[in-house]
Amino acid sequence: MLSAGFHSEIWRAFGHNTAMPKTSHPTKSSLIECAADLLDKYRFDEITVEMVLDRSGISKGSLYHHFEDIYHLLEGAMIVRYARYVDTNITALQSLLTTAKTGEEFYIGLSQLSAVTQGEGMKRARQERALTIGRAITSPRMSVLLQGEQQRLTDALVQLIKDAQSRKLCNAEIDSHALAVLMQAWTLGKIVDDLSESPVDNDAYLALVNRVIREVFVPQ
């Protein structure tokens, strides 16, 4: 049986207190973390070199020693934030797989996870993921970095789904890689409705996603 606190565990996993991954150089790490913090309050195109230097206390020479320009730094910060999203997704699903003992419990857990990731509270996170992906499409430099993080997420989901399939918690008739991509697609796809003048009723959308989970992931 799923623990009573499983829903709150999901919320904690998707909080914003996850530590930033460290790079090999402390100054570079500090600059990236500073830029990542600024992205909490400002748009990509609003952040300047001066804002980063004022906040970090690091010299301009050090910044340009590690980064070609401000965009190089901000791309690194966006990748770090994306990596944090990857880590929280993996943690939440690992927690579910550890807790669920039956297919029905796995279904309930996926439904709860879906409600969190597609709720109003994650709207900004969805927008940021879309912005990061969009930036990577036009920046070969960033694309290489994002490919690694995206592959890490997909690979982790594939393995988690395979584990669930081996325990008969999840439909074993569908390719685990295809299921992993679908799981990501329905969450990120909500960004389309986030930008709508007349958004869909979220309960209706979640009911539809739950039906997909029931009929595709965990059929009775």
Regions found by a protein language model. Give the residues of each.
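Hydrophobic/aromatic residues within well-ordered alpha-helical segments
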Residues: 70, 77, 81-85, 89, ...
